[in-house]
């Protein structure tokens, strides 16, 4: 059985948490596509050519411990603006999406570019301030020293870059369900996503 769930949205909106929970609930495979770009960005920061880094990416590269840092996020946004890098990673993502047993992919262009035929498309968002608060709490728990104001500025700069890039800009697919998590608990947001998927599965059985 092939069933693809595409979950897009800006940084720290909750799409990763929702994606992991949804994948576990339905026993689908999960791919955080942002890690692909973070891994490429990390290699570029170390001196690698962006396209060569993307073409030579291995699953083992996604296990690096520094991929969740703010620096890796900014590097990811820069390399994601390169059409050649995005093209090099498309086949990897599409192959994962159509695997047997179902798949959940989260990123910024899954529903619009990678899997426009996905059975379910969600676009997860939240206010800038709430996203900055969440990211600050996440980083502070790991000993991060960035202030909430600095994180807010970084998020807004990354949003601007992601929305204005020519290659696969950040935007919801026309048929995506918009899920604003600003006022939602994690459980409430996950439940809304599960309900949307279960509804689509029921429609497919009719």
UniProtKB/Swiss-Prot annotation:
Domain of life where this protein originates: Bacteria
GO cellular component, one term: cytoplasm
The reaction(s) this protein catalyses: CMP + ATP = CDP + ADP; dCMP + ATP = dCDP + ADP
MF-aspect GO terms: ATP binding; CMP kinase activity; dCMP kinase activity
TM region positions: none
Stretch forming the signal peptide: none
Pfam families, A to Z: Cytidylate_kin
InterPro entries: Cytidylate_kin, Cytidylate_kinase_dom, P-loop_NTPase
Family: Belongs to the cytidylate kinase family. Type 1 subfamily.
Stated name of the protein: Cytidylate kinase
Source organism (scientific name): Cereibacter sphaeroides (strain ATCC 17023 / DSM 158 / JCM 6121 / CCUG 31486 / LMG 2827 / NBRC 12203 / NCIMB 8253 / ATH 2.4.1.)
Lineage, highest ranks first: Bacteria, Pseudomonadati, Pseudomonadota, Alphaproteobacteria, Rhodobacterales
């Amino acid at each position: 059985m092939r069933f693809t769930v595409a979950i897009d949205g800006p940084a720290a909106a909750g799409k990763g948490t929702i994606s992991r929970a949804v994948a576990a609930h339905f026993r689908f495979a999960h791919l955080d596509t942002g890690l692909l770009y973070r891994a490429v960005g990390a290699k570029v920061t170390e001196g690698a050519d962006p396209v060569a880094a993307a073409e030579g990416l291995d699953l083992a590269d996604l296990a690096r411990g520094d991929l969740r840092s703010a620096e890796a996020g900014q590097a990811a946004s820069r390399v994601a603006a390169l059409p050649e890098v995005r093209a090099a990673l498309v086949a990897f993502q599409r192959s994962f999406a159509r695997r047997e047993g179902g798949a959940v992919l989260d990123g910024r262009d899954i529903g619009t570019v990678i899997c426009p035929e996905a059975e379910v498309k969600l676009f997860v968002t939240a206010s800038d301030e709430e996203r900055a608060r969440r990211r600050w709490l996440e980083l502070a728990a790991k000993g991060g020293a960035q202030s909430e104001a600095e994180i807010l500025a970084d998020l807004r700069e990354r949003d601007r870059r992601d929305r204005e890039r020519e290659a696969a800009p950040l935007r919801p697919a026309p048929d995506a369900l918009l899920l604003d998590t600003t006022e939602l608990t994690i459980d409430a947001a996950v439940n809304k996503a599960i309900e949307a998927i279960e509804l689509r599965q029921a429609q497919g059985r009719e």
